[in-house]
Amino acid sequence: MTLSMSIERGLTLVNAFNKETFIFSGPLDDPTTARFDLRLEQGGSGGGNALVHVHPGADEHFLVRKGRIKVVISGKEQSIGPGERAVVPRGQPHFFANAGEEPAEFTVEFTPAQQHLRFFANFASIAAKRTHWFSKQGDPHFLLIALLLHTYRNHLYLAGPPILLQKILFRILAPLARLKGYRMEIDPAG
């Protein structure tokens, strides 16, 4: 059972743990590109507390409108500001964070879209509504990670451990997560 939530244009979700605000302003059903706006407050990070991760099936694009962000791709840091862009090729380990003293506002795109809008809307909604599923530092419970990453297979994996191992582990743990009460806010399309 999932909760009754849908993604509508203009939906805004705040993940206070990571100091990030998601604004779903782009096309919602475009199979080629998933696009949303993101605001990171000072000290804010994306990717779950600046957790290094990979997107095996999509390239990730960042276009900054205001402020500065740092994007670390395969250990190489780049700082980008207004009008500048960074591209993370699929499969490359990366994370991003606000690199300035003011909020950073930017657009994130995934090509192809896969179901990244649903993936991030789920995560942000859960972080906003179910804070007890997270540590005080904002780290999601491991069973929640297993459920989310199994539900949205081939969207995001942790950098480091072999992806095949993560797939097997998350497939085993996802039913346990459901038994413990963890749920998605939005069903995957399908």
Language model segments and positions:
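Jelly-roll (double-stranded beta-helix
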Residues: M1-R35, G44-A58, L63, R68-G190
